[in-house]
């Protein structure tokens, strides 16, 4: 009941923010006083971005409101986690530099009172979705990981929402992977992390990034877990509707606004199935039949065939139409519980917490 009341209060806060933003922006649209306009700022990291809301550009105004709400929503997520698990898990927001110098936000989770001088095995957890971020779906997994003796970093790679308009831009398989690898290096350098016991865990697009990460830096991770990951981005683009295909092509600079038939090499580069020979880390692959987002026969099924043909060290489990399909890990089902057990058994084998 306490959590429900807290969540209800948070929802009221978001609604209030939306109404406040709407009224404020409406007032600004009528103002001619430049000083009045400049007082309205949207926080983007450490920068105050001033936007002239006297403009007739409705899209700009909507974008400002949308990004502001995403930021408020993300604050609520962190508050909810601390309210529910703060008696045993410490959440710390961090920022680290990616390979190109861009500061990337993230979260570090540790025991509330870490043992002095102890080096903990560590997990990089990688969310999926095309503008998703840390949210309630990860609460149970993070709590379990910390309770079982791991520390966790959760990078909010570029494309994640809740961190401003600039951070919202996606680069599929490029900046997301670079940001996750940078998180792993940052985490490995913390004094309570054992860099020799580092794992990576991802779902959906996060599974794709997990695979790309262990292919790009094969010696960095001691274990990896891919759950319903996108193994072939060329195949993904083949079965998506035209609006989605065009959206992906335009959003990522690496694709240059072109579809696979016009820029095939770029899409093949970000398809993990084409680089399996580089994998060194033991890999656990979990998937389900009946997945509409990452169909088994196009992604996981083919990935397992290639892993086997290349003689890679891996374990796998394919469920038969797990409830929820692509998002079966979000539900409390026998399949989800089995997947969690397999995941921690696998991590325990290679990281020995």
Give the positions of each predicted feature:
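Conserved HGGG/HGGXW glycine-rich cap/lid loop of the alpha/beta-hydrolase fold
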Residues: 132-134
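Short beta-strand element of the alpha/beta-hydrolase
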Residues: 117-128
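N-terminal targeting or regulatory segments adjacent to alpha/beta-hydrolase or S9 domains
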Residues: 20-84
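N-terminal cap/lid segment of alpha/beta-hydrolase-fold proteins
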Residues: 73-117
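Bacterial N-terminal signal peptides
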Residues: 9-20
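Short amphipathic alpha-helix adjacent to the substrate-entry channel of hydrolases
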Residues: 136-155
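Active-site-proximal cap/loop segments of hydrolase catalytic domains
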Residues: 95, 157-353
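Bacterial N-terminal signal peptides that target proteins for export
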Residues: 1-11
